[in-house]
């Protein structure tokens, strides 16, 4: 009886340790997998992947009714997170186009992360996508100017500029800048585009993204 108790205790301990060492957003990814197991969205669509600006865009398909979209934004993910889960949130869908919004959280989560580091992380993800999906167009939406993160703007703009310069030299890519269109007359983020947390957008903010992004989406 004592040995059995010790065995159960050890098994429970191992299970707890495994749960504690799971990478960030593991549960989000498992939720996608479960969803796909019962209702796989299909292949050959436009894939939106990235952080919470996509996660919270629940009605994205309504903004782009003529473009079939699979939204795989998750949590407050970073570029490292998207790269970690690329085999789960990108490649299974064999998309005809990939739209990425990510990088803001890399900067917000770590004061040592520079715009150059964000660019290097993006380049890693981009290289992975190109190696598996060489003919698939890639769209990157610039990191937005958020009121709550305005003090980080120098790092954000550096990252945007480096990514823009990099993509200019790559075929089948588009850099969609939302920066200027989200600024008010005072040159700061237009508060009316954001919800109370001053980070995530409301319908007015998403309407700007719709206008800037739609010309580049495949039918």
Regions found by a protein language model. Give the residues of each.
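Conserved beta-strand elements of the Class I
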Residues: 47-49, 70
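A short helix->loop->beta-strand "cap" motif at the edges of active sites that frequently abuts
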Residues: 133-137
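Extracellular glycan-modifying ectodomains
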Residues: 123, 127-128, 132, 145-148
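Generic structural signal for well-ordered alpha-helices
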Residues: 86, 122-127, 160
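Short amphipathic alpha-helices and their capping/turn segments at secondary-structure boundaries
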Residues: 36-46, 84-92, 128-130
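Oxyanion-hole/transition-state-stabilizing segment in secreted/luminal serine hydrolases
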Residues: 54-63, 68-70, 81-119, 139, ...
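Catalytic His-Asp segment of secreted/periplasmic serine-dependent ester chemistry enzymes
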Residues: 145-219
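N-terminal secretory targeting modules
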Residues: 1-47, 54, 62-63, 219
